[in-house]
Amino acid sequence: MSTFARLFLCLVFFASLQPAMAQTEDGYDMWLRYQPIADQTLLKTYQKQIRHLHVAGDSPTINAAAAELQRGLSGLLNKPIVARDEKLKDYSLVIGTPDNSPLIASLNLGERLQALGAEGYLLEQTRINKRHVVIVAANSDVGVLYGSFHLLRLIQTQHALEKLSLSSAPRLQHRVVNHWDNLNRVVERGYAGLSLWDWGSLPNYLAPRYTDYARINASLGINGTVINNVNADPRVLSDQFLQKIAALADAFRPYGIKMYLSINFNSPRAFGDVDTADPLDPRVQQWWKTRAQKIYSYIPDFGGFLVKADSEGQPGPQGYGRDHAEGANMLAAALKPFGGVVFWRAFVYHPDIEDRFRGAYDEFMPLDGKFADNVILQIKNGPIDFQPREPFSALFAGMSRTNMMMEFQITQEYFGFATHLAYQGPLFEESLKTETHARGEGSTIGNILEGKVFKTRHTGMAGVINPGTDRNWTGHPFVQSSWYAFGRMAWDHQISAATAADEWLRMTFSNQPAFIEPVKQMMLVSREAGVNYRSPLGLTHLYSQGDHYGPAPWTDDLPRADWTAVYYHRASKTGIGFNRTKTGSNALAQYPEPIAKAWGDLNSVPEDLILWFHHLSWDHRMQSGRNLWQELVHKYYQGVEQVRAMQRTWDQQEAYVDAARFAQVKALLQVQEREAVRWRNSCVLYFQSVAGRPIPANYEQPEHDLEYYKMLARTTYVPEPWHPASSSRVLK
């Protein structure tokens, strides 16, 4: 390590101490919160086991790993730990690869490291030259970085280092976060401030927050970021913006994070260079090849494009009589000489189809096997749109000859924005562990994504995170936990929601068991609570249109039927639910036969999906013994009670949480309880008005009538223009 690098690391170390000394807890550090180990016995043990940091190599990534270890160990062990490459001392932490570290090379780890690939790593307590050491070894510098973060996580979560011996490698290749950031810094479906990217000061000024953003993602093994909205502005490909984006790419590169861009399919026309964007027109093909060359001249390791095409008004190849494969392959050809890929979103639904549920499958399945090998279909977990609970997208089980990756949503578009606590880990786990039967037993979504089922070339997972300039990045402190769970599951889809929650709580708040266990259980139930007070039993899309915040199950008068709530629930005097069996839209036929058979049968379909696939009588007998009307009411009331239980749990944690974050979560849970009651009352009263059935007397009765809640929907979030006749009643 050069003298300059050592000086740089020292400056990083001392600079990192200043914010901790000057600021109270505000959530900025996320899970990289390196506070001293509170258990004094354990602290002394760690202090004995790691006394020195030995670093070989001088790449930006090795320097980033060394800086993180200095920062983390000095904080956790409550004593300065400085990186050196001098003579090995007893009880050192040694990091490196066999190529850049003679000490690592001396351990002859060749076969063990070879099995871990380019990004995997090995952590082990061993001896070198009779000296006690802990090693972080990998085949590449980025593997060393990932291993360094893992070692810090072990100490943060108070795992023993005695006899440490573990290895880890990612199961998925592309582990990517998506931002829906516009160039004016407004974040679509973002609830935590403005966009992180300050275009006005780039490329000259790189805010320290950009490096912290890279650290946060690298700590999870995330290796790519798409920094702009899928509803893309063509100007993102201009020289003016490419200069700025290149500066961001430079900041992210030491942390193993590739830069990707969302592109507008009509960009050749928008730039005025050609009068068409037809993907089979040679002029258009050449335009994209030339533009790709320009991008790579700015960003040599550019990852590729994310494309939303022929969806919700965005242009695409269908506007020129071409299909998705022809559009994607044209872009893929432009990127292929540079090693770039195309993430092509499968989120499509046209207004002229009988059932929106069927849209993506019917459009993409005929194209299976026609996409280029550097095209990856980016498919949402369900067939509609990030609803609180959806069945899995049938595309995952069907597209056996096409690269596919998952798209999850971390930003809470349908879970109460930044005001509701709704840990998404259980949703991710539920999806990834779903058995599709695509190739018999073991064909889980996770295994399909990994390439184990269909042997695809590219694998991956994307998460729409949408952080912003709020000090804590995500608005609600617990939205951080969903970001964390996404990253951990993108690295290893077999990690459970409970494990991710446990780690996050320990790293973010406290290791005290009296805190961990109740709050972890609160987190694990929070997603189900959100389902229950919004859309239980397989109901879906009951939101106020546009903002997607509050309830509006009565919506029936929008330009497109599939934007209304009544389209989905189909409630009437006699029953409720969407018939997707053979006697209905037959969307169930898109699934493998074992799934179609089980979900088409009222005796075997899971009750939490039943109204997705069946239109049932209000008198249908449920597993609880209640009829469907009674069960629906019960679920709505159960959701509110679950939120109230979450409040009681959090109220008991004041001794374990700093005052600022405790007060913020407490206040937000009060908002959530109020909104859960509004959801419950709005939906129960509306469905009562349709079914003509009473709310059982043993339940808390709504304070207001249905018309009140209809009016309230217009003023709670993004109010409609002022109309005294329709708004005055709400304001009384």
From Swiss-Prot:
It is found in: Cell outer membrane. Pfam families: Glyco_hydro_67C, Glyco_hydro_67M, Glyco_hydro_67N. It is an enzyme of class 3 (hydrolase). The record marks 180, 563 as: Participates in a stacking interactions with the sugar rings of 4-O-MeGlcA. Changing residue 312 to C: Loss of glucuronosidase activity. GO terms for cellular component: cell outer membrane; extracellular region. The active site is at residues 312, 385, 413. Beta-D-glucuronate binds at residue 231. InterPro entries: A-glucoronidase_C_sf, Glyco_hydro_67_aGlcAse, Glyco_hydro_67_aGlcAse_N, Glyco_hydro_67_C, Glyco_hydro_67_cat, Glycoside_hydrolase_SF, Hex-like_dom2. One of its GO terms (biological process) is glucuronoxylan catabolic process. Changing residue 563 to A: Greatly reduced the glucuronosidase activity. Keywords: Carbohydrate metabolism, Cell outer membrane, Glycosidase, Hydrolase, Membrane, Polysaccharide degradation, Signal, Xylan degradation. GO terms for molecular function: alpha-glucuronidase activity; xylan alpha-1,2-glucuronosidase activity. Its EC number is 3.2.1.131. Changing residue 180 to A: Greatly reduced the glucuronosidase activity. This is Extracellular xylan exo-alpha-(1->2)-glucuronosidase. The gene is gla67A.
